[in-house]
Structure formats: C-alpha cells, structure tokens
C-alpha cells in the first residue's frame, strides 16, 4: 500500500527556486565543483542560486533583537527559495563550523526559523581513511 502526500497543482511551466549552501569556505573546494555540476545536471524547471554565508559573524543570541544586515540578508535569502541543497564536507563526523553557524543564523530567533516547511537535501563529501 502506498501513501501519498497532498498533490501540488503544477503547470508545465512551473519552476522552483533552489538555494544551495556550500559547507566548505575554501574557494577551490571540491564541494563547490560538485554543486556547480549538480546545477548543470538539473532540469530547467529548477533555478539554482548559491546562498553564501562566508561573511556571517559568529552567532550569539545577543543578536536576536537586532540582527546585523549581513545576517538579515542571509536569512531573507534562505526564506526566498522553495528548497535547499546543502553540499558539504564531513569534518570530524559532523558539518563544518561555518555551516553550523549559518544554520544557527537562519533558524533564530525562536519562532522565525527560515527553514520551516522547506524541503532540503544534503550531498556530503566524506574524508575516508584506509588502514594498510
């Protein structure tokens, strides 16, 4: 038995805005190359835009009542897309600190989470070691 969610009415011309966040801050990151390759493989109905978090200061709840302009612009960019793609390396069995910081900015203050009801996917580049 298959359980399907509610169907979304789509016209043949429907397009979706997909924001992507690159977990590595390195300018020559393989994750950046992967993200660009994925955008080229996507159907024309998907419009991709990178949402950079490079300039975000470290998050603190002290900012919740007065967001810096760069953080407000980041939060607004996340809110403006229909879906998100995280293309990230795995550092120490987790996500990079910069990406964690970006997630904190977009999800705060309480009650204003920019990720709410937003489909997302994660592409992870893992550092693997082999014992010889």
Briefly describe each language-model feature range.
Residues 50-70:
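N-terminal beta-loop-helix "entrance" segment that forms/cooperates
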Residues 67-132:
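Helix-loop-strand module that forms the ligand-binding subsite of alpha/beta enzymes
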């Amino acid at each position: 038995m298959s359980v399907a969610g509610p169907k979304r009415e789509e016209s043949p011309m429907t397009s979706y805005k997909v924001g992507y966040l690159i977990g590595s801050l390195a300018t020559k990151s393989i994750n950046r190359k992967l993200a660009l390759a994925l955008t080229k493989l996507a159907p024309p109905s998907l419009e991709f835009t990178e949402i950079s978090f490079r300039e975000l200061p470290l998050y603190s709840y002290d900012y919740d009542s007065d967001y810096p302009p760069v953080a407000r612009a980041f939060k607004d960019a996340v809110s403006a897309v229909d879906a998100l793609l995280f293309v990230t390396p795995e550092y120490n069995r987790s996500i990079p600190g910069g990406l964690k910081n970006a997630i904190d900015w977009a999800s705060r203050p309480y009650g204003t989470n920019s990720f709410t009801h937003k489909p997302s996917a994660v592409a992870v580049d893992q550092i693997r070691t082999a014992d010889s």
